């Protein structure tokens, strides 16, 4: 039976347009049904506040982990740590059905340390993608209903793909920095499809699912070329990164079993474990530039390409889905009135704004899924040195009300705490 993507989109816990808090889900969107789910926007609140740029960002106050080469821009005696989280509100609409939900997610934990002069070490944890959806649709064919009784089809999923990484970077001469990261991808994706039969006051369910265990290693390379101009008043930075594509490995567990009215399994239809997980994370190429006046303002742009068309995902019953190449274009700006002002606090605040356009790796019902949005952000200085509270908001939209698709509007609030301390000062006296 072929169904529209979100026909009768109904949260299992509730229906209608009331907002719901989704516990333990890093996202809540019907589009996470496909592939490895919703790809998370990378970067801290500093990056997201500028539309997500970071490939050519060099900042000695905050950690920019979008390009491993950027961590050489730092105080050589400093320890830096960045911890972030976000909350995202989704408003989904499909013809006459609408729903609103909230999802909370840990965003990043990243630490950088100096090694020797203009070289540094970085380690961290970052979510790559999230799955979170719950919806249902009833059987509407009168012949099937008359023969088998009322039938409901449920789809629900959860899980995430994450990465642990450790990297290093160094300056080569006065105008070039290079860096490399070693990456460990890990996580589990759960996708379930249930069929519930109701007849003669008896409810029976056939529960089917696919559990994907992710385990793979990869690497990311980065470089930044930076040169002053206009009598050293401004700095131009060109950046590039490349992540190696990898099979995500791990096991796939396929299962199906029948339950009685109490939900207890009464018959296992099949249970297979396959170690040949063919899901692939394709290579990613990103380039960008920034122009800045130190401690005053910066403007920049990033472009990212990822060849998802070369990977394959299990089909989704009733939906025409295929993977395609993804593209994104991001622009951003930041401005600090006077970071050394001792009288007016808000002159020391850094203000940010940006925008983006993304063509997702998902092609649904023959149509490319695109998103666009605007972002705002700021850095609020805390205490001494460069400790700060970084805030950002992302307002965007993707999908449409045409071609049996879903229009999704979202607001994402991001908060990062930046810790900056001097750990490696030699004492003057014994």
Identify what each model region corresponds to.
Residues 4-13:
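Sec-dependent N-terminal signal peptides
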Residues 15-19:
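Sec/Tat signal peptide C-region and signal peptidase I cleavage site
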Residues 20-430:
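Subset of outer-membrane beta-barrel
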């Amino acid at each position: 039976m072929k169904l529209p993507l979100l026909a009768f989109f109904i949260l299992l816990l509730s229906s209608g347009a009331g907002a719901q808090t989704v516990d333990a889900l890093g996202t809540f969107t019907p589009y996470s049904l496909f592939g490895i789910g919703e790809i998370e926007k990378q970067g801290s609140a500093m990056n997201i506040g500028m539309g997500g740029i970071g490939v050519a960002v060099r900042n000695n106050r905050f950690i920019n982990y979008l390009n491993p080469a950027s961590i050489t821009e730092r105080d050589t005696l400093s320890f830096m740590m960045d911890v972030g989280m976000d909350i995202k509100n989704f408003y989904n609409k499909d013809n006459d059905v609408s729903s609103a939900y909230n999802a909370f997610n840990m965003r990043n934990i990243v630490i950088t340390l100096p090694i020797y002069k203009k070289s540094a070490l970085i380690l961290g944890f970052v979510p790559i993608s999230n799955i979170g959806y719950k919806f249902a649709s009833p059987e509407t064919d009168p012949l099937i209903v008359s023969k088998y009784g009322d039938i409901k089809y449920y789809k629900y999923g959860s899980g995430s793909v994450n990465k642990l990484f450790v990297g290093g970077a160094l300056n080569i001469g006065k105008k070039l920095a290079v860096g490399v990261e070693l990456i460990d991808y890990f996580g589990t994706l759960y996708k379930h499809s249930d069929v519930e039969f109701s007849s003669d006051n008896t409810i029976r369910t056939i529960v089917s699912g696919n559990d994907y265990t992710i385990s793979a290693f990869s690497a990311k390379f980065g470089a930044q070329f930076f040169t002053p101009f206009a009598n050293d008043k401004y700095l131009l930075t060109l950046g590039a990164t490349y992540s190696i594509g990898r099979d995500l490995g791990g096991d796939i567990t396929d299962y199906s079993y029948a339950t009685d009215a109490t939900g207890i399994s009464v018959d296992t239809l099949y249970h297979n474990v396959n170690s040949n997980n063919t899901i692939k994370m394709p290579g990613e190429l990103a380039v960008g530039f920034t122009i800045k006046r130190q401690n005053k303002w910066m403007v920049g742009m990033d472009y990212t390409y990822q060849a998802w068309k070369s990977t394959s995902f299990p089909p989704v019953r009733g939906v025409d889905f295929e993977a395609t190449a993804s593209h994104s274009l991001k622009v951003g700006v930041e401005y600090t009135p006077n970071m050394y002002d001792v009288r007016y606090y808000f002159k020391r605040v850094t203000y940010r704004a940006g925008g983006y356009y993304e063509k997702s790796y998902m092609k649904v019902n023959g149509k490319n899924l695109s998103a666009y949005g605007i972002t705002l952000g700021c850095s609020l200085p805390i205490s001494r040195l460069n400790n700060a509270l970084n805030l950002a908001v992302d307002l965007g939209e993707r999908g449409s009300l045409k071609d049996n698709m879903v229009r999704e509007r979202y607001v994402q609030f991001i908060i990062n705490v930046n810790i900056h301390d001097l750990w490696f000062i030699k004492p003057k006296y014994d």
